[in-house]
Amino acid sequence: MENNNNKQNVKNRNNLKIKFKEDFCNDSTEVEQQPPSNLSSPTSYIQGNKLYFNFYDNISNNVSNNYSYNCNNKNNNNNNNKNDNGNYYFFNSENILKNNLQQNETKNSCHHLNQSYNKIEFQNNYQSDYQSDNQSDCQSDNQSDNQSDNQSEIQNNKDGNESVVPPKVKKTRSRKTKEHKDQLENLFNSNPFPDAIEKEIIAYQFDMSVEQIVTWFKHKRENLKKAQHLEYKQNSTKKFTKTTKELYVYFENYPFPQEERVEYFAKSYHTSNEKILNWFSKKRYSLRKTHSFIYDKGCGLYKYENSNFNFCSHFPEKKFDINFINN
């Protein structure tokens, strides 16, 4: 009985295979000669009107198979078009799962490697930047220290040795010929105190600068003063500031001097009568607020008197030598 049952099962299975083959081949159209390259390795595929039976063997062994169909048209290269009559390809699901797992593992490993590489590169860049910053800071600190050391050394050298100070640059001296010197001597004898316009004219004539002319006249006056050669006329105001005691005494008694007295003072001070008169007028102007000038009928001269002090009683009139004026 068991043998009969086994035979019957084998017969039914063969009939099922043949029936499926006939139905499938009748409905199929022209197919490609080789499976497409973008699919994984199929366990079975259709070529022409032939069906390889490893597909049925897998069915008989109750292995879960994943199959898909791809409708291809000769005028269309799209493998996912469902409206086209086409070829049926069968794949093993275990292989697909393995391939997917392997691809996922490789993707994860690549992603992990990329992350680790980026992390290492970031660390290296950070370290290099940090080192470069430290080096630049160290260099700047060293430069500042060197500059401070150099400045301290220079200061010490200046304190310890005065020869470090650079010497002063001497001015270029004017080379004057003998003719120029003789002409300058003649100008000095005529006027030892030339004004600004005369100095410019002299400088233009002798092809010299105004400063050189000023220094030459100044040195000439100093040399004559040291040698006590005072033939030239000195400045009268300087001499008045030194010896004006006699003028003050006469002014206290007679603020308006007579002509004889003016000539006497001009000859004694080696100046002109006009400068003596100017001195008296300025002195009267300076005392205009504190003193009053009155006319003395007995003397016939103007005098000034103060409310607190009477100069006429304390300073008698000084007698002047008329012969000195005539001489």
From Swiss-Prot:
Pfam families: Homeodomain (PF00046). GO terms for biological process: regulation of transcription by RNA polymerase II. Residues 129-181 are annotated as: Disordered. SUPFAM superfamilies: Homeodomain-like. Residues 168-178 have a biased composition (Basic residues). GO terms for cellular component: nucleus. Coiled coil: none annotated. InterPro entries: HD, Homeodomain-like_sf. Its main location: nucleus. It is found in: Nucleus. This is Homeobox protein 8. It comes from Dictyostelium discoideum (Social amoeba).
